[in-house]
């Protein structure tokens, strides 16, 4: 990954790094699966693999994190080398990164986290909440990719 350092010393990914991860030079398609259970999630991943895609995001759209974690464990066990990112619905990295680090310690590797809200305030000079999230990520040691949304739906109005 490029040596370019961003806020809080986090390395900034360059386009070439992203393409290297997915072993392609063009657009990368990463479907999102709204998880219901292990079996349907596995069937959806099988369709994704059959289509030649390299990964997916899983989201717990209608249930909490505690019920989602066993699904993640089962899916990672079934697809140990498939690229998997997750979204814990409405959860920032502040809470998610320690959970992901714990999963990693137990052998459940999650490749990326997508947060709907990265807690960036475009009207502020300092980004205390985003910096706290970055510090939490560093402190817990989770090394996956982080996709953090800004001005995402259902958040505060943007000027």
Predicted stretch roles:
Residues 68-90, 130-146:
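Alpha-helix-loop-beta-strand connector modules within alpha/beta enzyme cores
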Residues 1-3, 159:
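Short intrinsically disordered, low-complexity coil segments enriched in acidic
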Residues 62-63, 91, 119:
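Conserved beta-strand edge residues that scaffold enzyme active sites
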Residues 56-60, 84-85, 112-114, 140-142:
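Short, surface-exposed, polar/charged, turn-prone segments marking secondary-structure boundaries
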Residues 95-158:
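Conserved anion-binding
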Residues 3-78, 82-83:
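Conserved N-terminal beta1-alpha1 strand-loop-helix module at the mouth
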Residues 30, 54-55, 66-78, 87, ...:
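Flavin-dependent oxidoreductase catalytic cores
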């Amino acid at each position: 990954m490029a040596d370019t350092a961003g806020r809080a010393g986090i390395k900034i990914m360059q386009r070439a790094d992203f393409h290297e991860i997915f072993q392609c030079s063009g657009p990368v398609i990463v479907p999102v699966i709204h998880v219901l259970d292990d079996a349907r999630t596995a069937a959806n991943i099988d369709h994704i693999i059959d289509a030649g895609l390299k990964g997916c995001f899983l989201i717990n759209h209608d249930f909490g994190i505690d019920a989602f974690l066993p699904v993640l464990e089962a899916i990672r066990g079934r697809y140990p080398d498939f690229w998997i990112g997750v979204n814990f619905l409405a959860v920032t990295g502040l809470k998610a990164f320690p959970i992901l680090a714990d999963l990693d310690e137990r052998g459940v590797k999650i490749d990326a986290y997508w947060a709907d809200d990265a807690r960036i305030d475009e009207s502020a000079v300092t980004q205390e909440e985003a910096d706290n999230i970055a510090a939490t990520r560093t402190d817990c040691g989770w090394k996956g990719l982080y996709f953090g949304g800004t001005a995402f739906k259902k958040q505060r109005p943007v000027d």
